[in-house]
Amino acid sequence: MRGWNVMVIGGGHAGLEAAWAAAKFARVAVLVSNPATVGRMPCNPAVGGPGKSQLVFEVQALGGLMGRLADDTAIHTRVLNASKGPAVQSLRVQNERDAYAERAQEILLGHSGIDVVRGEAADLEPDGCGGWFVVTTDGRRFHARSVVVAAGTFMRGVTWYGRYSRPEGRQGEPPSRFLSAPLARAGHRLKRYKTGTPPRVRADSVRFADLLEIPADPQPRGFTGRPGPRAAESPTWQTHTTPETHRLIQENLHESPMYAGDIAGLGPRYCPSIEDKVVRFAHHDRHLLFVEPDGVQTSEVYLQGFSSSLPPALQDRLVRSLPGFEAAVIQRYAYAVEYDVVDSTELTLNLESRLLPGIFTAGQINGTSGYEEAAAQGLVAGTAAARRALELEELQISRETSYLGVLLDDLVLKGSDEPYRMMTSRVEHRLIVRQDNADERLTELGVKLGLVDEDTQRAVQAKYRRVAEGIRALQMQRVQGQTGDAWLRRPEFALEDVEALGFKLPALSPEEREAVAIRVKYAGYIERAERQLAAEDRARELSLRGVAFGEIASLSNEAREKLERVRPLTVAQAAGIPGVRHADISALLVHLRRTGNVSRET
């Protein structure tokens, strides 16, 4: 019987990051049914987007893999919300689907500290000393001090094509049949969630001349600062549904397993199927769809926004009702997948089970949707699992300093009754935790945790010294009686416009130039946000002794009930109670100010 510090079950985006992070300082095994499926992108061939790119930049800052994989295999990059402020600007990178998985497998299989074990997990058994045995379906037993379960959509997975279903974790791959049982046996409340994927269409059957072309940004961007050589090679395109599309869907809703009642699982609110869009937004006469290549030389394109569980024969008619797709040939049909998830409020903020100490969960098993959310959780769970195995101090990531902290807080303290998607609107301090400064915020933590080496830390420190030098250069020069930073603060001026006036900057990378521009243009807003955050930090020490929580009308019912039951002594303790949300903490602070009860607990 072999043993490791950490065993990771699953090789998707969560499992990959968990193994990579844990292997920085522990012995790791990854249990997968088929090593050739590691790192696959089963849905859209892209990384990033609003709320998601911020997570990827943070994973990168903490020594993770996703940003590196995305940059290495990029074929199209765009900054979304570029006309808006830096708090919501988000990078989206289109990837070569097969190359992404191949690169992930190359890295994982080539790591000397990671053993890849082929098999299906059937059971989890405690060893009586704080560790675990992972038992496979063929009877093998593997020992680990900590286990990360990153099973994706595979736990009792069922795929649906119309009213026809079959046991699969995703198309063509068997489900994890037994892994739900030990979790349920321990008392975990399991729920059924559902997600879906669009059809893939033969590229040579599409009339691209009839589509709106969306070029890549002329200056490719990346998560690592080093986008791959093909990062601007391919455009994407846009089409839309038609009245005929909507008519076909409305007349055939009985063929949908969701609307026929066959699927009990809840689907993602922010990534609805095309059936849901037509039904829920019946007042819209069209829905925009994005046509994305699976690679530069691929024979397939992906219909972003057209996920469906309708029967294949109907999918043919639906796709051919779209402009540019009149002669389309579907190579892979859309489908829905239903699967088990745990109740994330039964986890700690390190994603460790409260019911099974030493068992960590990450990714879609925790009720999230998206590659980026999975990768972020994988990094946390893998790091925490390794630190537990080696009896090191627990990992702590703050909501106030990262999207990652918001994700953990939301999952564990709030929970979700539907697949959770990270969005910029969930983040209270988004002007402080931007995608452009993730390395500045988190590199030091990465070094402390053993995830980032000191050479990387020195490079980040040097980067921000150059940024500071750039800002000082603007402040020290004058043209027409005004300093460069004053010119740059004008809404109509970009950094290039300031340089055109004659201001000289030191040599800076594109990322450093962006950092200079953001810090100058938004200095007042950023300083105000930092003062607000500092005030909130001080407020966490305020005493709640004697507060009548039941009389505070602005609290949510759940928060009022839990605060009355737990009776926390400080605002910080109240913030740590599951079900007490950020809005409830704000309501408590308003109440304390109104009543004059602002003493600190000492």
Swiss-Prot record:
GO molecular function: flavin adenine dinucleotide binding
Binding site for FAD: G10, G11, G12, H13, A14, G15
Job of this protein: NAD-binding protein involved in the addition of a carboxymethylaminomethyl (cmnm) group at the wobble position (U34) of certain tRNAs, forming tRNA-cmnm(5)s(2)U34.
Name of the coding gene: mnmG
TM segment ranges: none
Region: Disordered, residue numbers: 217-242
The entry's keywords: Cytoplasm, FAD, Flavoprotein, NAD, tRNA processing
Family matches, as NCBIfam families: mnmG_gidA (TIGR00136)
UniProt-listed Gene3D superfamilies: FAD/NAD(P)-binding domain (3.50.50.60), GidA associated domain, C-terminal subdomain (1.10.150.570), tRNA uridine 5-carboxymethylaminomethyl modification enzyme MnmG/GidA (1.10.10.1800)
Binding positions for NAD(+) per the UniProt entry: 267-281
Protein family membership: Belongs to the MnmG family.
Alphabetized Pfam families for the sequence: GIDA, GIDA_C_1st, SAM_GIDA_C
SMART domains: GIDA_assoc_3
Name of this protein: tRNA uridine 5-carboxymethylaminomethyl modification enzyme MnmG
Keyword NAD on entry: yes
PANTHER family the UniProt entry points to: GLUCOSE INHIBITED DIVISION PROTEIN A, PROTEIN MTO1 HOMOLOG, MITOCHONDRIAL
Cofactor: FAD
GO cellular component terms attached to this protein's record: cytosol
One GO term of the biological process aspect: tRNA wobble uridine modification
Database matches in InterPro entries: FAD/NAD-bd_sf, GIDA_C_N, MnmG, MnmG-rel, MnmG-rel_CS, MnmG_C, MnmG_C_subdom, MnmG_C_subdom_sf
Subunit field text: Homodimer. Heterotetramer of two MnmE and two MnmG subunits.
Taxonomic superkingdom: Bacteria
Location(s), subcellular: Cytoplasm
